[in-house]
Regions:
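Glycine-rich phosphate-binding loops at beta-strand->alpha-helix junctions
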Residues: 34, 209-242
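Short glycine-rich, Thr/Ser-proximal phosphate-binding strand/loop in the N-terminal lobe
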Residues: 5, 16-63, 96-98, 163-192
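Glycine-rich phosphate-binding loop and adjoining helix at the ATP-binding site
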Residues: 49-73, 77-84, 90-144, 184, ...
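Short glycine-aspartate micro-motif
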Residues: 25-29, 82-84, 145-149, 219
Length: 274
């Protein structure tokens, strides 16, 4: 793809005809155990309460979408102008390719962003991996920054000088004695091994990631970050669990054109909202 065509694509993403100003962004954070949502202003400030419900089981696409519609009803009295989705699986071009923590038998090439957007009247939508969306809220925009989320599974994301380096999927790679990151430091591992052993595993994982990525900063998020009890290295910090929602604003207001190159083109065609 030529530089010229990339530039044109970036321009079309940010100024598509008919797309409203992104001043009421519905941000959705889909997790293995919970679904969360809030309405954000363009600067990331919350314009509604943050609402949450357990993830339905079985977590089929239709069940997740139906549950989300019920969840967000109280906070969208005024319709959202844009939709941001963080999803715990492999996402390409607003389509879920796989989602082991929700059930790969249900999640194979599922156009989830379009499914949710259609229920909201065709609102422009973007969807990325949930660790990537959390990272957009946490990063400082300088050097190599990595994100590790500790929840049902283990999510990862990587940024360079504020630019998302997309699709870093370490969760199902082996990390210790044949166990994957999910199996080693996911929630099932914490419950089985106990917090003390799990903390030692997370501490070991931080060292492994430092060797792997040689990061300048590591941001740790997710619900299980609250269970960390050891002293973190000076270049490692825990971020608010709300970051998974707050990063949704950055999908529509990236801090630089560098970030925009790695964001999916939204689901609308030019003039679709006219």
């Amino acid at each position: 793809v030529s530089t010229e065509s990339k530039t044109k694509h970036r321009t079309r993403v940010s100024t598509a005809k008919g797309a409203p100003k992104a001043d009421r962004i519905l941000a959705i954070d889909i997790g293995g155990t919970g679904l969360k949502a809030a309405v954000l202003a363009e600067d990331g400030e919350m314009k509604s309460e943050r609402v949450r419900v357990p993830t339905p089981r079985p977590a089929t696409p239709d069940a997740v979408v139906d549950t989300l519609m019920t969840l967000i009803e109280p906070i969208i009295a005024e319709p959202p102008t844009h939709l941001s989705i963080g999803f715990p699986g492999v996402v390409r071009d607003n389509v879920v390719l796989t989602a082991p923590n929700l059930g790969n038998e249900y999640w194979y090439r599922v156009p989830l962003a379009d499914m949710i957007a259609a229920r909201l009247g065709g609102v422009p939508a973007r969807m990325i991996n949930d660790a990537e969306m959390q990272g957009l809220a946490a990063i400082e925009g300088s050097g190599i920054e990595m994100v590790l989320t500790l929840g049902t599974g283990a999510g990862t994301a990587l940024f360079r000088d504020g630019e998302l380096m997309p699709h870093l999927e370490l969760a199902h790679h082996p990390v210790s004695k044949g166990r994957t990151y999910d199996e080693y430091i996911g929630n099932a591992a914490r419950e089985k091994a106990g917090n003390k052993r799990w903390n030692r595993r997370v501490e070991k994982t931080i060292g492994i990631l430092a060797t792997l990525a040689n990061y300048d900063k590591l941001w740790i998020g997710g619900g299980n970050a609250a269970h960390l009890k050891f002293d973190l290295p000076p270049n490692v910090a825990v971020v608010s669990n709300a970051a998974g929602i707050e990063g949704g604003a950055k999908l529509w207001h990236p801090r630089s054109v560098r970030e925009t190159r790695q964001l999916p083109h939204f689901n609308q065609r030019e003039g679709a909202l006219s």
